[in-house]
């Protein structure tokens, strides 16, 4: 068995540089010399502690939002704060006999950026931290720095923000020329300049010279004093900049005094700063359509859902046909506030709680896991649609921003046409059995359908006694109302069989009824044999089929001759028809028995057929 070596990583906020960088410390060296086991000799299950130096603030995501300035994309590329630029400017002033510049807005201060980065490890030389902007908006800050237009602004809270430039030189010029030394540093610089000027005056008084020379020396003294003042001012100011002290601004902004310094990486927006903002409550929150006052979480969720729906409807052209191929650029991140539809807060606290509970239930219902069966039987495939809308909850995340790209892509994706549904195997078997039963019933009905074999069904006919019809025709009297037959037996419709066990004559003989639409009855021809009007029922013509197949004669004489001539052949036809009817009746009874057997089957019994076997193979 190979030895198992464990590793334990401990994150420490402050750790010595030696162990963090992997350098051997004296304690470790002494431990190794004392005979501690080497890595190859570590026993099984032993843990080794490896310290890792990592700041916890670096793990926190950056929630700052940038407000871009359209006029801040210009860069000069000239460093006027360098020593070479200042020396050239002084030489040019001496050449043309200019006095030293006393204007604080155009001071010559040499700044060593490498020294600044060493003194302040996390400094951002292209960014200036400003505090005291309680009543100022984003446009007010941009207009305040219009002489040095910045690139964008990062708001930290109601009282402070970071103003960012595209280069370090412009930010340094703005900080030095738009701010001054603190009051204590000014006093120190004045004291130093006064001491040096007093010493030089004493030296000048001790020297004896002519009046012309004194005048010239006086001019030189003035120049030297001014040079000394500039040197001391730059030295004190450089020390103040190295300490990164807050510098008061030269001009007021809306009656407030601003203070500025170089920003550092620790100057970040705190979590939940937007909810605690008094400026948003007083002047309106631009992230929510400029609404003033306290905004509840339910109101924010409704606002975000409406905003996303409006973006999908109005800006559908920005999203390609294939979602994900074209990137969606959100246009609400700029400074210009898009006019939004105000949403009034009509609900009270109780109604808001109810809505939050309903939304949580809806979200839980939307998050259900479902399984899709891709191959199903054709009878089971039904068009079902399901639309899922995901809502972003502001209470779960402290940041006020949303990933609009992700939300829009998820909403714009079409819902699947096939519904995803989880079913049990027993349900599938039962559905297959139902389909098989329905198909068997359809086959049995179609096979035993008499209408399809014989022909189209005649319109509903009313049967009456032939004798009454013949008597009425003869007497030219008004016909009686037809007698309704309650019996619907097939034997009455087809007539009696030729070898019927019943007696030929009875006290109340059953007479076969014929339709009133018979051709012979319409022509008024009596249908009787030579034996008499009331002959045996065996010799009578059968049913509706004979009346449909037989052709009526043009004259009465021809009709009587043809009836007498075709009497023996008609009996043979009747026997054939009766046999066919008997076969059909047997088939119908057999189909009923099959259906009764299928209905009595248990619900989980499986019948193997071609359709079921092919469906199972497709599913496998």
UniProtKB/Swiss-Prot annotation:
There is a cross-link at residues 12, 70, 186, 541 (Glycyl lysine isopeptide (Lys-Gly) (interchain with G-Cter in SUMO2)). Signal peptide: none annotated. Belongs to the NCBP3 family. Residues 209-230, 341-365 have a biased composition (Acidic residues). A motif (WLDD motif) lies at residues 155-158. GO terms for molecular function: mRNA binding; RNA 7-methylguanosine cap binding; RNA binding; RNA cap binding. Residues 15-42, 185-233, 332-419, 436-620 are annotated as: Disordered. The modification Phosphothreonine is found at residue 413. Residues 185-198, 366-388, 459-474, 511-521, 554-569, 585-598 have a biased composition (Basic and acidic residues). Associates with NCBP1/CBP80 to form an alternative cap-binding complex (CBC) which plays a key role in mRNA export. NCBP3 serves as adapter protein linking the capped RNAs (m7GpppG-capped RNA) to NCBP1/CBP80. Unlike the conventional CBC with NCBP2 which binds both small nuclear RNA (snRNA) and messenger (mRNA) and is involved in their export from the nucleus, the alternative CBC with NCBP3 does not bind snRNA and associates only with mRNA thereby playing a role in only mRNA export. GO terms for cellular component: cytoplasm; nuclear cap binding complex; nuclear speck; nucleus; RNA cap binding complex. The gene is NCBP3. The modification Phosphoserine is found at residues 25, 73, 209-210, 415, 620. One of its GO terms (biological process) is mRNA transcription by RNA polymerase II. Keywords: Antiviral defense, Cytoplasm, Isopeptide bond, mRNA capping, mRNA processing, mRNA transport, Nucleus, Phosphoprotein, RNA-binding, Transport, Ubl conjugation. Residues 15-28, 611-620 have a biased composition (Low complexity). This is Nuclear cap-binding protein subunit 3.
